[in-house]
Amino acid sequence: MANLRKTHPLLKIANDALVDLPAPSNISVWWNFGSLLGLCLAAQILTGLFLAMHYTSDIATAFSSVAHICRDVNYGWLIRNMHANGASFFFICIYLHIGRGLYYGSYLYKETWNIGVILLLLTMMTAFVGYVLPWGQMSFWGATVITNLLSAVPYIGNSLVQWIWGGFSVDNATLTRFFAFHFLLPFIIAAATMVHLIFLHETGSNNPTGLNSDADKISFHPYFSYKDLLGFAILLIALISLALFSPNLLEDPDNFTPANPLVTPPHIKPEWYFLFAYAILRSIPNKLGGVLALLFSILVLMVVPILHTSKQRGLTFRPITQFLFWLLVADVAILTWIGGMPVEHPFVIIGQIASFLYFFLFLVLAPLSGWLENKILEWY
């Protein structure tokens, strides 16, 4: 008799994805981040659910309800710290996952890659509306500044902003709908993740060589299930350590002050994981231009597969493009630093140079270096 896990209508779906899935034998720890993102999403949904049980989405009580969660709810402080810092770990894993995809040419699985970019946008939206919920100073002013960017849309801009606000300013209606969005979006992310996996399992995983690995596959369980569990343990230990020892390390001090529409904080800035995009937004002196640059800083990932010129898939054997990849990593680090700095000399010009380089690397230098490496291969 055939094994139940291979015949049962539900179990065989799980079996084909988690047990008998053929995986390349040589995928490295860089292939762990997909499952770590799944763990992050599960942790965020779980902690978020418990926070939502005690949170009130009303401007009169939102700030107090978060304080109440941290002071009076059993282990509420832990749940809140895990949720807030879990978002940071979520984005660390996302950026490493995208970096892996760029380095090893995983973007050539176009459907998987494009769903991944959509997942990134959904996660950024979720994190943004979530940051507004505690209704501190930075929550309020962050919401005001970022939603205001939509006024740059020609003709319908102002109507669009007021429609999203539900009034003439960021107010009670805004907070209530942002809570609704923040509750709903993670489940949409979970659904999109399933689509991401469906497309991935159509082709199978890429591997560090970028070569076809059909001749050398091993089963996902036990090899990679245990490898993933090791990753889970490391991530959870890191997250719990941050949440217990230094929970406010990545938090903005302004957000410990209740929202006040009459007092603008001296430096309005988003959470650290959005600073690179914020720096690109600020580096263009025109409002609409800045908004488009902000949007394209993420959407540029979608054109990466189209601009792939190399005969080789990954960067394993491509030293010139390798150098450009690490230049991009350094550039994003510089943009992250600039995004948290005041708008004054020399930060403005550094941000503008870094923003230009960001797009130049993706759109010009990477395709050129791929072409050049092809030529070098022909010469030798």
Curated annotation (Swiss-Prot):
GO cellular component terms, semicolon-separated: mitochondrial inner membrane; respiratory chain complex III
Membrane-spanning segments: 33-53, 77-98, 113-133, 178-198, 226-246, 288-308, 320-340, 347-367
Family annotation (PROSITE patterns): CYTB_CTER (PS51003), CYTB_NTER (PS51002)
Record's protein name: Cytochrome b
Pfam family, one: Cytochrome_B
Record's keyword terms, sorted: Electron transport, Heme, Iron, Membrane, Metal-binding, Mitochondrion, Mitochondrion inner membrane, Respiratory chain, Transmembrane, Transmembrane helix, Transport, Ubiquinone
UniProt family annotation: Belongs to the cytochrome b family.
Record note on quaternary structure: The cytochrome bc1 complex contains 3 respiratory subunits (MT-CYB, CYC1 and UQCRFS1), 2 core proteins (UQCRC1 and UQCRC2) and probably 6 low-molecular weight proteins.
Domain of life the protein comes from: Eukaryota
Gene Ontology biological process terms, A to Z: mitochondrial electron transport, ubiquinol to cytochrome c
Record's function text: Component of the ubiquinol-cytochrome c reductase complex (complex III or cytochrome b-c1 complex) that is part of the mitochondrial respiratory chain. The b-c1 complex mediates electron transfer from ubiquinol to cytochrome c. Contributes to the generation of a proton gradient across the mitochondrial membrane that is then used for ATP synthesis.
Positions of a ubiquinone binding: 201
Primary localization: mitochondrion
InterPro entries xref list: Cyt_b/b6_C, Cyt_b/b6_C_sf, Cyt_b/b6_N, Cytb/b6-like_sf, Cytochrome_b, Cytochrome_b_C_euk/bac, Cytochrome_b_N_euk/bac, Di-haem_cyt_TM
Keyword Coiled coil tagged: no
Cofactor: how bound: Binds 2 heme b groups non-covalently.
Further remarks about this protein from its record: Heme 1 (or BL or b562) is low-potential and absorbs at about 562 nm, and heme 2 (or BH or b566) is high-potential and absorbs at about 566 nm.
Gene name of the record: mt-cyb
Protein location: Mitochondrion inner membrane
Cofactor(s) recorded in Swiss-Prot or TrEMBL: heme b
UniProt KW Ribosomal protein keyword: no
Species for this entry: Tropheus moorii
UniProt-annotated binding residues for heme b b562: 83, 182
Binding positions for heme b b566 per the UniProt entry: 97, 196
Coiled-coil region(s): none
Membrane topology: Multi-pass membrane protein
Molecular function terms from GO: metal ion binding; ubiquinol-cytochrome-c reductase activity
